[in-house]
Amino acid sequence: MPANGNSHAYFNIDEVRSKNVLKQITQLINEVTNITETFPLKPGQTTEGLVATLDAAVANFLQTGSFAISKCPIANSDPRAIDLLHEALGAVQDTGQVMIQTGRDFVRDSTSTNKRAIATNSGRNLLTAVAKFLILADSIDVKVIVDKVDEVRETAHQMIEADTKIKVDDLYNLLISQIEELDITVRRRAIDLVKPNQRDDLLAARSALRQTAPLLYTSTRTFVRHPEHEEARRNRDYTADEMHSALNALESVLNGQQPKVTFSEYGRIGDLINEIDTFQNRIEIDPAHYRRGTDRPDLEGHCERIVSGSASIADAESTRENRKQKIVAECNNLRQALQELLTEYEKSTGRRDDNDDIPLGIAEVHKRTKDLRRHLRRAIVDHISDAFLDTRTPLILLIEAAKEGHEENTRYRSKMFQEHANEIVSVARLSCQLSSDVESVSVIQHTAAQLEKLAPQVAQAAILLCHQPTSKTAQENMETYKNAWFDKVRLLTTALDNITTLDDFLAVSEAHIVEDCERGIKGITANASTPDENAANCETVDCAAGSIRGRALRVCDVVDAEMDFLQNSEYTETVKQAVRILKTQRVDQFAERASALANRQEAHGLTWDPKTKEEEMNEFINACTLVHDAVKDIRHALLMNRSMNDVDSDVEYEADGVGAANADANRTISEQENQQNLMRRLPEEEKKKIQAQIDIFKVTQTRFEREVAKWDETGNDIISLANNMCKIMMSMTEFTRGCGPLKTTMDVIRAAQEISLNGSKLNALARQIGEESADSQTKKDLLAYLSQITLYCQQLNICSKVKADVTQVGNELVVSALDSAMSLIQTARNLLTAVVQTVKAAYIASTKFRRPNANSVRVEWRMAPPKKQPLIRPQKNNAIIRRASERRPLQPAKVLAEFTRNEIETGRDSDDEELDRRHQQRINGRL
């Protein structure tokens, strides 16, 4: 805020990093501007009273400031800072007195321009002085925290340099006490920070500090006990570097600087998902504005970048061959659909007549993009499912080998563990390419980076344990690294679950169970002429059975976690019951039968004849079917609470449930039967044709939203009527797909009648606007569009009598309603287009060509206000199926965290007492 006149001081509001400081500055700004600005006085309020209020506020500020300076914790250690505070407070006092005097002079003669300017200048000087004092006080608070960081750094350095275990233990106890003391102030500071990214970075550094302390302790003790081993030194150096990095990050964020590595910098949306979103937004171009020289290269460039990013996922190691082929096919389909759309754009250049070719081309590109998204998502879920199938066994096998003291086996297991770690890190990073959830992406990328650095140290700890298998210190060190690894893997798994849709996960799990079953069948039917070959076949069957069991239990864990966050209902109980059946019955039955089969193969596999192999193969298939059917039952239970629009599958139309299409097939269908259900039973070919028309209607709907929804309905009946007509037409088109609020033919007829009524009102109002406007081409266009609305409303009334024709062929009912459904959708689209053109023409006629002597304005053309934004920005998820976590109630842990924050904000005195108590304990301990 600059100061004018004699004022030469400036302060930048962006320099304020504390919410409390910002709040106090804002409050004082309101007090001062109440005097210097024109505003209505409240009943009983006087201008002299405002000056008195300001005087009291300044006096209270000076008193509070003096008390705070007297209690400043650095009063003895840094007298220079205290002097600066006194000087800043003195400036507040001086400028406050001047402001009160000039303010009093101004309110007594408020018509004086000179006195107003002097009062305004004095107010700015006072605000600048107060802001400088508060910013200085805040910087001293930061210095106090930084001093605590330096204490922790010094203690950590002493512990690293310690040469006895007793010193290490004593210094570690002191370090933990200092970290706990620092943690209280850091949490308080994090809540008070204005910028969210600084708050996230500070909390991430705090978390890293707390997690690194136990590793530093065990690594240092191990190095003191076994200094002759290079692995011990590497562990200690790693933890020392991590400790220093965390402390440096804390200090940088506290000082308002950018740390070398921050948590917030990982929150970047992947290039591929960004390209797909941009591409879908760019393909819808007004044909009149299409330019071949710029639009074609731009769209083709976006398409090729999408294809390139998709190819990197398709070529990844764990991508299934069939999924790869689908991705390649969809990329080619997307290219072809884009070229056809661009060709239609170029054909329409200079042509005024509208046709369905461009909307149909846009709908086709959207459909191909949607299909490509689905295949890419499920390819990534393939990777996640394989990499995170068993995250514990590689490390457990490594530790067991190390405890046995077998170096060769330990190094082999270490290599396998490192490969496993590299796989989960690469899969985690790959998954971020298709997620727009910034928070989850930040957690995934940050945790993956930590795991990448931690994995070699876990291997070093295991090799050290292999060299000293009886050392208690080495065992404790290994245990600490193991716990740290599992904690971070658990966090990474949770974050990946947050960006994975349940439908994708279950669909992929079903497919993987089938793959594992086929792998087991190959192990059963493979020929074995030697014991080694038979053992290899047995291992194949055993691994396949273990994978199936692991995938089934993983399904149970994921679905149970989702249901735990939903309120109890019949739906959740149905899903939980399906999970219980899989977990407590089917998995155990499968494990028992698979184990018995493996034992039989191990004992008699060399003597199996083809008939025996076929019997054992059927036994394995039946056992796998138990698990596969149970997983499918869980998926069906989850879909019971979904509408058709929520299901993103290879088939656009889904049956209501098992047996829904055949239920009561032989009964006679009456006139009053729910026609919506009959529309769902249309032949697939008719459904596809109807869906193509609906896709075109959605393109027109998008144009409607872009042209009409930007206007405010308040005071504009044209916009209100148009929006209402659009909503009803959407319901009518949904009826042709067998969903939506309209159930019977009578519902559709009533909806058409309501559209006709709204169309008549719109026609009358727009015609009056046209009559009041000057003669122009716009007036002629408006009247022409109104005649189209009348025509299409009449056609819609006729088409609304859509009814499914039912004929019986043998024992099956054949439903057909293609012609009437197609006519209904096409008429609704034409009507919607006419409404859009009418709104545009009415706006131009009423604002640009209105006659000067016309009556009062019939409608008010105002831009719609921005939609209300939630206090907490919701996470954006491009997936079709939303995870239950996005509609779940507030988690108990989150409620507790909010309670803790409030307690920190309101209970500062208790924190201060706790800090004083810890400080006194440290002093007594040193004495």
Swiss-Prot record:
Deleted gene: phenotype: Worms arrest their elongation at the 1.25X to 1.5X stage.
Record-linked InterPro entries: Alpha-catenin/vinculin-like_sf, Alpha_catenin, Vinculin/catenin
Gene Ontology annotations of biological process type: cell migration; cell migration involved in gastrulation; cell-cell adhesion; cell-cell adhesion mediated by cadherin; cortical actin cytoskeleton organization; embryonic body morphogenesis; regulation of actin cytoskeleton organization; regulation of protein localization
GO MF entries: actin filament binding; beta-catenin binding; cadherin binding
Any one annotated GO CC term: cytoplasm
Coiled coil: 319-354, 672-696
Recorded family membership: Belongs to the vinculin/alpha-catenin family.
Region described as Disordered: 901-927
Known tissue expression: Epidermal cells.
PANTHER family according to UniProt: ALPHA CATENIN, CATENIN ALPHA
Gene (name only): hmp-1
Entry keywords, A to Z: Cell adhesion, Cell junction, Coiled coil, Cytoplasm, Developmental protein
Species: Caenorhabditis elegans
Pfam family, one: Vinculin
Locations listed in the record: Cell junction, Adherens junction; Cytoplasm
Residues spanning the signal sequence: none
Function: Required for cell migration during body enclosure and cell shape changes during body elongation. Required for proper localization of other junctional components, such as pac-1.
SUPFAM superfamilies linked to this entry: alpha-catenin/vinculin-like (SSF47220)
Designated name of the protein: Alpha-catenin-like protein hmp-1
Quaternary structure and interacting proteins, as annotated: Component of a core catenin-cadherin complex consisting of hmr-1, hmp-1 and hmp-2; the complex localizes to adherens junctions. May interact with hmp-2.
Domain of life of the native organism: Eukaryota
